[in-house]
Amino acid sequence: MSGMNMLIVQPQWLDAIADWEQELRHAGRSKDTRYTRTYHLRRLAHDHRNHSPWDLTRHDLVEWMADHDWAPETRRSYRSSLATFYRWGHAMGHITVDPAFTLAPVKIPRARPRPAPNDVVDDALRHVDLRVRMMILILAFTGMRRGECSRLHTKQLERDLLGWQLRVIGKGGTERLIPIDDQLAATLRLLPSGWVFPGQIDGHISAHYLGKLVSRALGDGWTAHTLRHRFASLAYAVERDIRAVQELLGHASVTTTQIYTYVPEQSMRRAAAGAGVGLFAA
């Protein structure tokens, strides 16, 4: 049973969340974004079953968020969901004061990339079934987000003058092309036409479940996202072209891409040594 289905949500919350999701759909938010946002509100609803969504105060929201030991990125995502929901509720006239309007922004500390090591990936590939093996290979070879991988369809495989590529629909509905090698393309071409990973979410597997399977296969805290870090770091090491990596990952900002690309210690040592060349000869 999914986490969404285990939550107890009262009808007054369900109605409000459903109306809000329609607004998100109208605004062109992706399926993954809508799922994440509504899941956050369902968790809030589950923990406030004796209250209407329009009864909660700023203090209630702050107390609720403070009670959870979330990673900074997760905390920022929850804050964004609350802010979006209550801004909509205020605009619709459900409340006269937006309780999330003055919630403090969440500071994200600068983190080093965490690319999954080759030995971890190789070991996982030797011990998983064919479906999970395909998930890991696609994520490792393309750097796709888990949601993009979960929605992968055979019709997204294309060929141009330079070779095979995948046409990926990313965040905000933006398209990008990811070149792939002939071996992965040949494997995808052997699949029957349709979703690469069939499931119960409009015919395909959910991003959450795909991520769970990959994390379980990799072990030791490695995830689908660390495969994305791995792809970014290796791609950058080949050409040292951060803009190329940005396009491959589908980032709106190159600043985000820099967070994903691991710079080897040897490179930093060479750079530091180069800065001091000739000083002692003077």
Predicted features by range, described:
Residues 1-9, 276-282:
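C-terminal secondary-structure termini that scaffold catalytic or DNA-interacting sites
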Residues 18-32, 38-112:
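N-terminal core-binding DNA-recognition domain of tyrosine recombinases/integrases
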Residues 95, 118-146, 150:
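Basic, Lys/Arg- and aromatic-enriched nucleic-acid-binding interface segment
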Residues 95-97, 108-123, 172-182, 192-194, ...:
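DNA breakage-rejoining catalytic core of tyrosine-based enzymes
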Residues 142, 151-188, 255:
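Conserved tyrosine-mediated DNA breakage-rejoining catalytic core shared by Y-recombinases
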Residues 157-159, 220-221, 240-261, 265-266, ...:
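Short, polar N-cap/turn motifs at the start of nucleic acid-interacting alpha helices
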Residues 181-221, 225:
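Active-site/catalytic core of tyrosine-dependent DNA strand-transfer enzymes
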Residues 220-239:
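Short basic/aromatic active-site micro-motif
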